Amino acid sequence: MAYELIAFDMDGTLLDSHKEVLRSSVDAISEAVAAGKHVAIASGRCPRMVSMYRESIPGVRYAICCAGAIVFDLAASRVLSEVDIAPEVVARAIHTADEEGDYVLEVTTGLGIAMERRGIEMAPQCGVGVYKQLYLDTSDIVEDAHVVALDPTARIPKLNFHFVDAAARDRTFERLADADVTITRCEVSSIEFTCPGVDKGTGLASLASKLGLDISQTIAVGDADNDLAMLRAAGLGVAMGNAIPAAVEAADVQVADNDHGGCAEAVRRYLLA
């Protein structure tokens, strides 16, 4: 099979343990682009956060953002497709989370996210302290994120709840299992919500279609729960060496970890083979 598109998850995959892109990854991506291949990022992050890395990896033109809810052209700074969560589902999710424990609300709106300053300061307590500076640099700081989320006219492709307590996260997850929404566990004690049937796998399929490719011509590289659908949907699923067991099981092959050239290995061994 000749693969034409490779999509990399960011955290734990394209980014190393220091949240930086390895030189080996940059070089391999440049080789892929020079060979006429397409390279994309597939992330739970919003377009604004993903765009911050474009200078580090200039060969990457497309991004599957918000866990598949937005397909974005980085070069043109343009949304190619967006799928939003129904307002009544947003309201139910927030009211349920409110009953289960203390959490930080991250609301994706447009190309960025809305967060409260108090919430950003709480990031370390919720297992997402590594993103605190990123939140400060890229978020729209609002007085009350709940007001933003509960506005019935708002377009919200993704919601994130970062709980102080993982048990509260799990209770919320179970209570919303029947909701008309896709729910995924992420980080230490977080959950993210997208429209039903939307995940990185559907985002990958959408991008492939826009590029005139079949999904069988794609490679997906990831390490975590929110990569499972993408790993299964792609023509070739590649798990990182640091991937969780479920990701290894969902993938077809495994490469080195995110600190030791796994992404470069995926490009050279499978995309450019």
Label each residue range with its predicted role.
Residues 3-18:
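Asp-based phosphoryl-transfer active-site loop
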Residues 19-37, 82-89, 141-145, 197-209, ...:
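Short, acidic loop-to-helix structural element flanking the phosphoryl-transfer center
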Residues 20-128:
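Active-site phosphate-binding/coordination module
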Residues 36-40, 59-61, 158, 216-217, ...:
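Short active-site oxyanion
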